[in-house]
Swiss-Prot record:
Pfam families: SLR1-BP. PANTHER family: DEFENSIN-LIKE PROTEIN 165-RELATED (PTHR33830:SF21), DEFENSIN-LIKE PROTEIN 184-RELATED (PTHR33830). Keywords: Antimicrobial, Disulfide bond, Fungicide, Plant defense, Secreted, Signal. It comes from Arabidopsis thaliana (Mouse-ear cress). InterPro entries: DEFL. This is Putative defensin-like protein 165. Disulfide bonds join C31-C78, C41-C60, C46-C72, C50-C74. Its main location: secreted. It comes from the Eukaryota. GO terms for cellular component: extracellular region.
Length: 84
């Protein structure tokens, strides 16, 4: 009986500690910046440039939509700094 009671108590403590931490966490904001506007995007170069400049992930996106022209867009973390 006492082992079962102790197990329930520990479960309650863990649950309570998780619930108190959850409101303190903040999702990091993601931003997008167009790199080399007007130039045709080459994916390998775009990813390298984005990582070097903003520590982000580069992607070629159609601009304007429906055309055959692509521009380099860099997606990176721009929100408040994390704890890690």
């Amino acid at each position: 009986m006492s082992t079962k009671l102790f197990s329930y108590f520990m479960l309650l403590v863990v649950l309570f500690s998780v619930l108190t931490i959850i409101p303190k966490t903040e999702a990091q904001k993601r931003c997008r910046q167009e790199l080399e506007p007007g130039k045709q995007c080459v994916l390998a170069k775009c990813r390298e440039l984005c990582f070097k400049q903003l520590k982000g992930f580069g992607s070629c996106i159609e601009k304007p939509p429906g055309s055959s022209k692509y521009t380099c867009n860099c997606f990176y973390n721009c929100g408040p700094p994390g704890f890690f």
